Amino acid sequence: MCITVISIISLAGIIVMLQRHISRRKIKERFCLVSSGRPVGKSCLIMTMQSCGPIIDKALECLSSNDNIEVCKNHRTGSQTIDIISDKVRDCSADTEGKIGKTSLYCEYMLEATDKIAETTRHLVTSPDSYIPISYKCEIETIRGGIVRLSRLADGILGVDDDIIKIAGDTGLEKDFIEHSIAVHSKGMTHEDFDEGAPAYSYLMLLYYLHSFVSFFSQALRNIETNNKLKTA
């Protein structure tokens, strides 16, 4: 009986390991970086945005629907994706001395912010006193829609300067909305709400990480614009 139980547990462990290996392989194949005709900085930014966008989208969806199973799954699989993409960003952009380019550095920051977003939403949804007011949900759905839109526009980074300027403008609007949300939320918080682990504080930190993500994307776009101008000067 004991041998049978041990065998079942061992088999289950092997299956889990195989599933993780297959999952990581699929992620690597999906984001196998960019053909040799594309500029490296733009390619890294597109890959980063298109990998982070779905993770953030799912995290905010789980927060709105209070889905504690999917939010944990998203954090786990999202962390795997982020690790792989982070390695690819460094591999594709490092020079002979191993230094990473400025645009790719912003991509690293975007990946870190995405991991924090997935982690914070998991904490908010799974905490014992996880109550998300309707006002928060409306706010989150608005931010979610904005980030999904930016993720879909990411391919435009490879286009002409006018496309990049348009994306930068949309990014600025998203950034302004999150800044406004942070100001309103922090103004309405009590002294106790600022205790670490309090739902209101965790929500404030989520807004901060979302703002960081959009800000780093904006800075990466500006860096690409600057590089384009230098090349055409």
Question: Where are the model-predicted features located?
Answer:
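Cytosolic, long alpha-helical scaffolding segments
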Residues: 1-4, 8-233
